Amino acid sequence: MAKIVDIKGREVLDSRGNPTVEADVLLDNGIIGSACAPSGASTGSREALELRDGDKSRYMGKGVLKAVANINGPIRDLLLGKDPVDQKALDHAMIELDGTENKASLGANAILAVSLAAAKAAAQDQDLPLYAHIANLNGTPGVYSMPVPMMNIINGGEHADNNIDIQEFMIQPVGAKSFAEGLRWGTEIFHHLKAVLKARGLNTAVGDEGGFAPNLASNKEALDAIAEAVANAGYTLGTDVTLALDCAASEFYKNGKYKLSEEGEYSSAEFAEYLAELTRKHPIISIEDGLDESDWDGWKILTDKIGEKTQLVGDDLFVTNTKILKEGIDKKIANSILIKFNQIGTLTETLEAIQMAKAAGYTAIISHRSGETEDSTIADLAVGTSAGQIKTGSLCRSDRVSKYNQLLRIEEQLGSKAVYRGRAEFRG
């Protein structure tokens, strides 16, 4: 049995040019597992704490040397000599050492980087692909499925410097026969969308997640542009390809009202109806954070209104936290959870959230953050848990494409065992 003999933390840069944490876990047989913590832009108020230095003389206060010091000091001391394969013991030891509800002492970014690096080292030690090791940790050994990609091809909200309120307009290649085919479809649509926007005299610069970030007159205009791109690419909207939204509604919820820059002001019930009307007019099969994270009454209205046929995803609402998710399940709020490692801070707690969601009949979507690195762990997480869906941005920027490329490798490795369920992963 291999043992951990060293742990090293360092400050590296994410895709937005901000510092983040990378950790190496070294084993006594020479194996090294490395992982980076991602960082979000639109964040839920109840997420685990991302520890930043606050020193304005370095990186405008966004440095992570405190988190790195916690890795190189107390976390290293705690885990030396431990078995890397026992993920639960490692994660619980770090949680106990931190001693806070939201990992504010050591920093969720420090704990997560070590948690994921240990999992990578353990996978190598057992001569397993990371997704296979994750499946073992998940209690589903040998069970894998390829996720349907939810491709964010128009960026708005906090992910872009434009006037679109809704943060993400996504496409899903639900009619494809494999992940590789679905990725090709999405890429072709992405390039056709660029041509559509150019023909309209619109900007084709991209946002944080690689989607285009044009100034459009309304959210409807974004949907219309995507519909034109899908048709121009030779696919049928509603059968080959469907749509999804991430409203990130907490970002435009002010004083009890939802305020859209071009389309007016709405109460909770009115905005729920606004979203319902969008699903009637467009083949939108998934809506994320359609209402504010604190507007549970509004969420209940939306769930009762369209939850039977539409996937309603809690991101800021649930923040990958089993306590909050259980409350949502009990109250029949939403029907899906977005899974982000760094919202909770360990691999073990991430797996627990996925397991709780699935047991309750909720879907679980594995997700990146807007501040990413070349680390592709979420691709292995999606396959190893058979989550069925993944959000990892658009079809450009290497911080996004690295995850897609890892999924291509995994599908090739699995061969005939690779299952891609397409539309069956969604409601309705």
UniProtKB/Swiss-Prot annotation:
Annotated cofactor note: Binds a second Mg(2+) ion via substrate during catalysis.
Q: What InterPro entries does its record include? A: Enolase, Enolase-like_C_sf, Enolase-like_N, Enolase_C, Enolase_CS, Enolase_N
* Record SUPFAM superfamilies: Enolase C-terminal domain-like (SSF51604), Enolase N-terminal domain-like (SSF54826)
Look up the record and name the cofactor or cofactors this protein needs: Mg(2+)
* Catalyzed chemical reaction(s): (2R)-2-phosphoglycerate = phosphoenolpyruvate + H2O
Does this entry carry the keyword Magnesium?
yes
Which pathway does it operate in?
Answer: Carbohydrate degradation; glycolysis; pyruvate from D-glyceraldehyde 3-phosphate: step 4/5
CDD domains linked: enolase (cd03313)
What the record says about family reads: Belongs to the enolase family.
Q: What does this protein do?
A: Catalyzes the reversible conversion of 2-phosphoglycerate (2-PG) into phosphoenolpyruvate (PEP). It is essential for the degradation of carbohydrates via glycolysis.
Sorted alphabetically, which PANTHER family does this protein's record hold?
A: ENOLASE (PTHR11902:SF1)
Protein name (database record): Enolase 1
Organism of origin: Pseudomonas syringae pv. syringae (strain B728a)
